């Protein structure tokens, strides 16, 4: 286990360089996640014979990716970043991938911000093309979880979002301190386990939009659990009743998904 515990000391976050441009493993994992999500979406469209045109699907993923990036970055700046006012007064720096002339990529993304950007992009896309947003949302619920696994692996390889201090034998040393590899816990619970739940729910689906609500509930619950092993966000710490900001946002997300599900399922609300 010694090699594993000291993996960060033996691993370079930079995969390779092209003409002086450093390509990080995180970026590679992010691209893999995007491609996998699209491929899975096309697979599920065929498998479940969904009424979605492939050309529309390709366009939709472009819209969604833009929404996700904007939402994730802005969400991080507004919720987590200690330099919020700096970015508000210097908006051109929000997506600046350089620090002191060195390319480091765009760092600082919020999953919950990404969700908001994703929903806005979906609604705008479906309004423009006059399509049912719930069909696309349910498809995303099936396609994203397994792709999400690579995103969390990217966090692990990038040596960020590490866990709390521990003494478990599978912990990893971060700056000389043994910590939980919480990114991998998240990859498993928020990715693989959530996918299994949503996939099984597909065979008992009773209304359009049910899968995205199941996903929201399952993800938020998994994230809430994982936050117990993840180091609270720097500069924020524990926010309320010993909970991290991630747990508070996940709790809100879970309650929202549950209420919408109950209203639709049992109150026969039309969507």
Swiss-Prot record:
Membrane topology designation: Multi-pass membrane protein
UniProt key word Cell cycle: no
Molecular functions (GO terms): phosphatidylglycerol-prolipoprotein diacylglyceryl transferase activity
Biological processes, Gene Ontology terms: lipoprotein biosynthetic process
Keyword annotations: Cell inner membrane, Cell membrane, Membrane, Transferase, Transmembrane, Transmembrane helix
Pathway per the UniProt entry: Protein modification; lipoprotein biosynthesis (diacylglyceryl transfer)
Location, primary (coarse class): membrane
Segments passing through the bilayer: 25-45, 60-80, 103-123, 134-154, 181-201, 209-229, 235-255
Subcellular localization: Cell inner membrane
One family name in Pfam for this protein: LGT
GO cellular component, one term: plasma membrane
Top-level class of the enzyme under EC nomenclature: transferase
Enzyme nomenclature, EC number: 2.5.1.145
Binding-site residues for a 1,2-diacyl-sn-glycero-3-phospho-(1'-sn-glycerol), renumbered to this chain: 152
Its biological purpose: Catalyzes the transfer of the diacylglyceryl group from phosphatidylglycerol to the sulfhydryl group of the N-terminal cysteine of a prolipoprotein, the first step in the formation of mature lipoproteins.
Family: Belongs to the Lgt family.
HAMAP family xrefs: Lgt
Name this polypeptide is given: Phosphatidylglycerol--prolipoprotein diacylglyceryl transferase
Name of the coding gene: lgt
